[in-house]
Amino acid sequence: MDLLLGIIQGLTEFLPVSSSGHLTLLSHLLKTDLNAYQTAVLHLGTLVSVVLFAFDGIRRSLRSWRIILNLIVSTIPAGVFGVLFEKQIDQLFSSPRFLPLFFSVTALILMFTRYSSSGEKRMENMSFLDALLVGIAQLFALFPGISRSGITVSSLLFMKYRGEDALQYSFLMSIPVVLGAGILGLEKGNITILAPIFAFLSGLFALYVLSRSVRSGKIWQFSYYCLFVAILSYLVG
């Protein structure tokens, strides 16, 4: 079970298909109880993979005070919302009832990137307003079925940022949110150490695939898969 959870978490955390949605669906299919805290523990494995994968870019980015301040602004919406509605969010992980809706939202967002022209805005020059807007987008990824990487990268592409910068900023945004949730999950979850390890290994592969799809402008292709999972979750829900 830990092997399966870890692999699914690693692959779906960075591919824009929602890891939390997949884990909620798997929990329903296997009749197991997987809550938001246990999911957060799995995130710690993928957190290590993103730090290693993008280490040089992260190190360069964090030399800029503007980027650091923007990251703080981007983190606030999800952090505040997660604390205020902690119990309600956790309840969403106990049932697949809303998965068809949330997976469909992810599919729609990804599909729109196909018709969004490429931009030239750089992460180093991001305004506080843009940082806040992408932070608001990220808070919706607290709902299982809405992809964090999908909604943050897509939002930045819609705001005319370069694909590379959208990807890099999405990576940076994930660190404080995932770290905070993971630490909380360590206290309340009961996932063994094997699951995060498998999540780390499969996460590295997923990061490579995501990077190639964003750079080639083909992230929208994942919308078909999200639509398929939306239909599947409706049929089994």
UniProtKB/Swiss-Prot annotation:
InterPro entries for the chain: UppP
Biological process per Gene Ontology, one example term: cell wall organization
EC number per UniProt: 3.6.1.27
Subcellular location: Cell inner membrane
Reactions the enzyme catalyzes: di-trans,octa-cis-undecaprenyl diphosphate + H2O = di-trans,octa-cis-undecaprenyl phosphate + phosphate + H(+)
Signal peptide positions on this chain: none
Any one GO molecular function term: undecaprenyl-diphosphatase activity
Topological type in the membrane: Multi-pass membrane protein
Enzyme class: hydrolase
Misc remark: Bacitracin is thought to be involved in the inhibition of peptidoglycan synthesis by sequestering undecaprenyl diphosphate, thereby reducing the pool of lipid carrier available.
Function: Catalyzes the dephosphorylation of undecaprenyl diphosphate (UPP). Confers resistance to bacitracin.
Similarity comment: Belongs to the UppP family.
Protein name: Undecaprenyl-diphosphatase
Gene: uppP
